[in-house]
Regions:
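Transmembrane beta-strands of outer-membrane beta-barrel proteins
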Residues: 31-37, 66-68, 125-129, 198-200
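Solvent-exposed loop/turn segments connecting transmembrane beta-strands
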Residues: 38-47, 118, 208-214
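Membrane-embedded beta-strand positions in outer-membrane beta-barrel channels/transporters
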Residues: 31, 50, 107-109, 180-182, ...
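Short sequence motifs at beta-strands and strand-loop junctions characteristic
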Residues: 43-46, 98-105, 169-178, 214-216
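Short glycine/proline- and aromatic-enriched beta-strand/turn motifs that initiate or cap beta-hairpins
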Residues: 19-57, 63, 225-228
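Cleavable N-terminal export/targeting peptides
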Residues: 1-26
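Gram-negative (and chloroplast) outer-membrane scaffold detector with strong preference
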Residues: 21-22, 54-148, 189, 217, ...
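Extracytoplasmic loops and strand-loop junctions of Gram-negative outer membrane beta-barrel proteins
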Residues: 33-37, 89-95, 162-169, 205-207
Length: 228
């Protein structure tokens, strides 16, 4: 019995230090994070990368800024591709259109932290900025006659030929207003380092040369951050 009592006493004395060594999310003056993940738009999915940093301005409030990249927001490009194919079809030329729409963006905003415990730090955020849209297009010949009277092989890329003779307008890069809302949770890994899992909704204003409607995206983000 005496041995049991000694063991219990030792356990009680050593337990606090052991628990104190468990990683926890420390309150910090700022953070730097890198994220990757998938973003869904118009029924399609693509990749998303974000580099972000923030500084504290109040006990549970930070301002943040980020730079990100969408790999391909193709659904926003499709209306202009369809319109071009329809116009060429009315002139007796059958083509199928495809393309890509990568976009870089930058945002600044406010992030509110919700300190639920030392083992997790939920947050919500909102930001406003701009997205730089860089469309590319590609049209393949299917039927009919080219403006110069030629008939390429089916499946031939006729984009350059149609652009050079003025039948097709080359897509132009443009900048559009973008806003984001979302949230996530930071989980401690080691001292000052955290894993970050979150969700972000973004809305990119309509570019009349690409689509008449704004583009909405839904992204899941996964990353790591350093709190300083």
């Amino acid at each position: 019995m005496k041995a049991c009592g000694v063991a219990a006493t030792l356990l009680a004395l050593t337990a606090p230090p052991l628990f104190a060594q468990e990683p926890s999310v420390e309150k910090a003056g700022g953070y730097l994070s890198a994220f990757g993940g998938a973003v869904w738009t118009g029924g399609n999915s693509t990749g998303n990368a974000i580099f972000e940093g923030g500084v504290r301005i109040a006990p549970h409030m930070m301002i943040f800024g980020n730079i990100g990249h969408f790999a391909d927001l193709q659904p926003d490009l499709q209306p202009s591709l369809d319109a071009a194919a329809t116009a060429l079809s009315s002139a007796g030329l059958g083509v199928t259109g495809g393309g890509t729409l990568p976009a870089w963006y930058g945002l600044a905003g406010v992030r509110a932290e919700l300190p639920a415990s030392k083992r997790a730090w939920p947050y919500v955020l909102g930001g406003l900025g701009a997205a730089r849209l860089n469309p590319t297009q590609e049209f393949m010949f299917t039927s009919g006659t080219m403006p110069d009277g030629s008939m390429p092989d089916v499946g031939s890329d006729v984009t350059a030929a149609l652009t050079s003779d003025g039948s097709l307008a080359a897509p132009q890069s443009s900048t559009a207003l973008m806003l984001t809302f979302g949230g996530g949770v930071e989980l401690p890994v080691v001292k000052r380092w955290v894993a970050d899992v979150g969700y972000r909704y973004s809305r990119i204003a309509a570019d009349s040369s690409l689509s008449a409607d704004p583009l909405n995206t839904n992204a899941m983000t996964f990353g790591f951050g350093y709190r300083f």
